[in-house]
UniProtKB/Swiss-Prot annotation:
Signal peptide: none annotated. The keyword DNA repair does not apply. It comes from Arabidopsis thaliana. GO terms for cellular component: mitochondrion. InterPro entries: Pentatricopeptide_rpt, TPR-like_helical_dom_sf. It comes from the Eukaryota. It is found in: Mitochondrion. Belongs to the PPR family. P subfamily. This is Pentatricopeptide repeat-containing protein At1g51965, mitochondrial.
Amino acid sequence: MKLLRRRFFNSVNTITRPNRRHYATKYVAKVTSSSPSGRSLSAEVSLPNPLPADVRGYPLPRRHLICRATNLITGASNLSDAFSDLSDYLSSLSLSLTPDEASEILKSLNSPLLAVEFFKLVPSLCPYSQNDPFLYNRIILILSRSNLPDRFDRVRSILDSMVKSNVHGNISTVNILIGFFGNTEDLQMCLRLVKKWDLKMNSFTYKCLLQAYLRSRDYSKAFDVYCEIRRGGHKLDIFAYNMLLDALAKDEKACQVFEDMKKRHCRRDEYTYTIMIRTMGRIGKCDEAVGLFNEMITEGLTLNVVGYNTLMQVLAKGKMVDKAIQVFSRMVETGCRPNEYTYSLLLNLLVAEGQLVRLDGVVEISKRYMTQGIYSYLVRTLSKLGHVSEAHRLFCDMWSFPVKGERDSYMSMLESLCGAGKTIEAIEMLSKIHEKGVVTDTMMYNTVFSALGKLKQISHIHDLFEKMKKDGPSPDIFTYNILIASFGRVGEVDEAINIFEELERSDCKPDIISYNSLINCLGKNGDVDEAHVRFKEMQEKGLNPDVVTYSTLMECFGKTERVEMAYSLFEEMLVKGCQPNIVTYNILLDCLEKNGRTAEAVDLYSKMKQQGLTPDSITYTVLERLQSVSHGKSRIRRKNPITGWVVSPL
């Protein structure tokens, strides 16, 4: 029987040898006849269909097998179970994966970590994968595109395993590595691999290497690679050229590269010219930049908004107002819409060259592109630069727009009018803003209140405050604080107290600034005792006085020659951890000097120096008076110079 089996398998081998397959497969034979003695038999074997192959004879990947393997790996909850199921599945079919199929499975896995684990398993599933560079290329590419924090170390580990296993990569391996690594050391390692694997760099390899050096900002090596590309007769695409030009923007070498593009018949696009225009501007060659612009037009190219802005930035740097306006006019003619940055370049140029009167012409040129947003930007910018009349004129143009206005532009105009002292215009504007669909808010009212208070226009404050309470919006804590300070500034103490009491009855509650304003109002108008009462009141309400509170009240006591009270407040603020500033020391020094307490004033000055405060001009004025007293010099006492030392809380 053993002999029969041996003869049977020998006959099977004889039958199948001409079409031997490279993959382990089970064969089923059907016995068709046997000898009477049973010592020989005939069997019929049905060979499986051969694997489909491409035109070169390489087997095509079996898609159903790839999908099944991918589903087994990704569908399992446990990784070890997934790989075990895959191994069992392949064993049940007596199949092995081809390297291409393993590569496709790697590509189908959506997790880089899962791909790495499968890559480790591939040698046991695919006997011919050990020396396949394409499989290594696939896993390196997957890692290079991942966000794994240790992806660089993982790729280096794979390269080490390739070296140890004597696996030679191909030029695609090097290209992937160059595109992945970013530092010079790793790039040098890639070049060593080229020599080790006896590879020849192609145009794409040189392009990858050039871009890698540019990304790592190693511009000298990048230019060396470019020179090698020229010597080798390799070609670069427009993207690589533009990237190199942008990197060499501050270098004369950019001009050489630009000329090489023409010699090598690489068509220069609008981005190329934009880069070169910026380069000429950086090295101060404005005329050459204009020449490039004209050359670009001759070649039928059109700049986009970035290109036009770049050219106008160069012209602004060269103070070429006429040329900048000409370029702006052409920009509009070609249908390129200017943006805020375009207008900012022209506006700053006109302001710097004292030709702001030409702004109306610029606006007229781009009339069809003027929007509410552009008007708003110009109004805000002119207001910040202090050109109130021009801002107001543009604002009037903006007012004619039928669309809803922007709050920021109206706010900027209000601030400009108030800053220029045009409070009547500001009040009128405040009353008409709602016509443009902009709701007047508390900040707008506060801006106008603050300007009226500084100009002591109390009658307008009364009227506007009544209108605010009647029509809205509701006053906030800042409104009340501004009003208290404004009434105190003109000596209307009763009105300031009324506002403070109204604040207490409102939803807003007085804060430290409210009390500081009221204390300053009371003290400066002679009611020091009431100011002191308010000081105690704020402490009872849980508000901690700050340095402004103490300084204000100390100044009030100093003016009424109540030195002990002033000094007591100074000691109290130190105990409570409130650090005095230079204004506090100046007030107390002046108080002590005026009352002849020279020794205490000198001691106080020493404390001030120990605290690390720097004396100012007022400090030195008081010290000069102290020195003149110590030398017995007679002098005429001038008007109290301390008035106004304490800055308004607002």
